[in-house]
Amino acid sequence: MVTVKNPILMGFYPDPSICRKGEDYYIVNSSFVYAPGVPIFHSRDLAHWEQIGNILDRPSQLPVAGADISDGIYAPTIRYHDGLFYMITTNVTHGNNFIVTAENPEGPWSEPYYLGDDAPGIDPSLFFDDDGKCYYCGTRPNPEGVRYNGDWEIWIQELDLKTMKLVGESMAIWKGAVKGCIWPEGPHIYKIDGYYYLLHAEGGTGPEHSITVARSKKLFQWFEGCPRNPIFTHRNLGMDYPVIYAGHGDLVDDGKGNWYVVMLASRPCKKHSSMGRETFLARVIWENGWPVIAPGVGHLEDEFTIDMPEHRFAEEITNSDVIHFWGEQLDQRLVAIEDWTSGIYSLTEREGALRMYLRKEKISERANCAYLGVRQKS
């Protein structure tokens, strides 16, 4: 048995996506304009995590110059299929939706395959069907005309893995569970016991955030919603609850019939969320063909046990605060704004130390200043 303590990734690790290869689990998160981008983590017990790299680790993969601080890289999805890892995400500043691939999750990852104007919207995901075909699932504005802010829909289209281009016709499959839904986003598709399930967030990534689910026997048709939607939210607990904004989930199983979901949430302090949106884990069971998140509890737990052998790492993201400056590479937890390769630091001017080189830009400005930071955890 292993004890899971939430959040499993403390600090600014929003929009988590998870996949499994054998007994190994991998999580990726949004990174916006911070560089390198899209941190990737590894675990063997879902409780203890080590950072194994940053997927977008060179400027050619991460063109975010001039972007607003909350633009850049949105909501990545990670999947493993037939010997290859796929990460798909949105660069809302340059190029929009793209895919990178790797045989090893530690890298190197490929140059981006941009999907172009054929893939509008944000929060893309990939689904691999039983026949090996791959499908793109994303969000886009209501094509009949946006009636209100957040009037979007979820759509799918086949992806040719040889050309990395969308083929065939796209189809809208869902607009959200709640009447007048805003921001149906973060969609993920799974095939379980003969049904295609669509898990997604709605309500906006704030007080009304939630997780909803729909299903269908066929991929290219309108999905039916779960009668219990939203299947998970903290909106009913109030803004004084210790954990708020819960939503944006991704399911994973352990290969033995046990299911879990990762999601984002925030821990407020004096009405502010200084650590941003963090990554949490919850148990999932299935009843009458629908997922139940945090069964018997109904909210994110501070800690719980799961039937899995414990596996610890030398330096875990959950408890290690020490950063060294020995060697030729920066600690992978450190991030710059926009670009970390343009001479803002040195690790060789003084042995075992970091030297920063000033720029004329101020940190109070929205500019590419001389800056290296690490995510606050508590």
What feature does the model see in each segment?
Residues 1-378:
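Carbohydrate-active catalytic/glycan-binding domains of CAZyme proteins
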